[in-house]
UniProtKB/Swiss-Prot annotation:
The lineage of its organism: Bacteria, Bacillati, Actinomycetota, Actinomycetes, Mycobacteriales. It comes from Rhodococcus erythropolis (strain PR4 / NBRC 100887). This is Dihydroorotate dehydrogenase (quinone). Its EC number is 1.3.5.2. It is a peripheral membrane protein. Monomer. Binds 1 FMN per subunit. Catalyzes the conversion of dihydroorotate to orotate with quinone as electron acceptor.
């Protein structure tokens, strides 16, 4: 049924259909009777799925990745829609329009998306208004990025401005230095550039702070960021963001080239995201939480990430292609696998493929 609907939606420009679908999600979860009904259908309330991470309780391990709810306008929708948590943003200190349209593209043959949105959002103050009014349903993280017009030398102050507004309202913060769509942003992943940014955010907020990294980092750079995260006392790492690579796609090269620059998400990112997860867990898995994101489409893949060391997992593109029952399907599948493996809770499964 959803595949038929998806084929119809794919006839509408991606950004427009995103707006329509997002509006519908907010509408059906706005009023208590509808919200209750939606949650009754989509939420998997199973004790084996509950876990603790950086002082928070997560009712289920699959969360909505950043990028879908950029301004936190749908912050009350994600729990009833079946997600165990959500990450809003990316939010910048100053409002900005992002890159010119078209800036979001589908690759159906690859079950992937390319985006060059460019952190389009209404600013941290605007998002703060919605976070201030939210109901307490599931944990909400605020993903913050650098304002495009701000020079790299002033990045720490820019991130601090967002953290000051959102830190008191979110359950955790994610510092995004890994989007390919803001010029120079990924350069901030270098340890000497990243250190003052992370320290500034840590000094500003009292909630857990994580950093989100790119799949295109070399293994050595992944290690360096992981070591820095431990040194500074971060709560965790979100791995990974979108990739700038285009190899191995089923979509013809000429079509891909015609779409231009941007970050690729979805199924093609899965292998590298899993590689980065395993590397991070081997290095720092006993010291912090790892949230794995990138190419997760099925319960088997989510379970694989958990066994490889992810305490929590996230999706965005999988939700687009999987539809409204996607989170429910993932969570029911994980619960089944937890019990089949003889575990009493999902926490026992984290990193089980390489026990410490």
């Amino acid at each position: 049924m959803y595949q038929l609907l998806l084929s119809l939606m794919f006839r509408v420009p991606p950004e427009r259909i995103h707006h329509i679908a997002f509006t519908a999600m907010k509408l059906v979860t706005r009023f208590a009777p509808l919200r209750w009904l939606v949650a009754k259908v989509l939420v998997v309330d199973d004790p084996v799925l509950r876990s603790q991470a950086f002082g928070l309780t997560f009712p289920a391990p699959l969360g909505l990745a950043a990028g879908f709810d950029k301004d936190a306008t749908g912050v009350d929708a994600w729990g009833p829609l079946g997600f165990g948590f959500a990450e809003v943003g990316t939010v910048t200190a100053q409002a900005q329009p992002g890159n010119p349209a078209p800036r979001l593209f589908r690759l159906p043959a690859d079950r992937a998306l390319i985006n060059r949105m460019g952190f389009n959002n209404h600013g941290a103050g605007h998002a703060a208004n919605f976070l201030r009014q939210r109901r307490v349903t599931v944990p909400i993280g605020a993903n913050i990025g650098k304002t495009k017009i701000v020079e790299a030398v002033d990045a720490a102050a820019d991130y601090t401005a967002s953290a000051q507004l959102l830190g008191p309202l979110a359950d955790f913060m994610v510092v995004n230095v890994s989007s390919p769509n803001t010029p120079g942003l990924r350069d901030l992943q270098a340890v000497e550039s990243l250190r003052p940014i992370l320290q500034a955010v840590l000094d500003t907020v009292s909630v857990p702070v994580l950093v989100k990294i790119a799949p295109d980092l070399s293994d050595e750079d992944v290690d360096a960021v992981a070591d820095l995260a431990v040194e500074l006392g971060l709560a965790g790492i979100v791995a990974t963001n979108t990739t700038i690579r285009r190899d191995g796609l089923k979509t013809p090269d000429a079509e891909v080239a015609a779409l231009g620059a941007g970050g690729l998400s979805g199924a093609p990112v899965a292998d590298r995201s899993l590689e980065v997860l395993r590397r991070l867990y081997a290095r720092v898995g006993d010291k912090m939480t790892i949230i794995s994101v990138g190419g997760i489409e099925t319960a088997d893949q989510a379970w694989e990430r958990i066994l490889a060391g992810a305490t929590l997992v996230q999706g965005y593109t999988g939700f687009i292609y999987g539809g409204p029952f996607w989170a429910r399907s993932i969570h029911k599948g994980i619960a089944k696998r937890v019990r089949a493996a003889g575990f009493s809770s999902i926490a026992q499964a984290v990193g089980a493929e390489n026990p410490r």
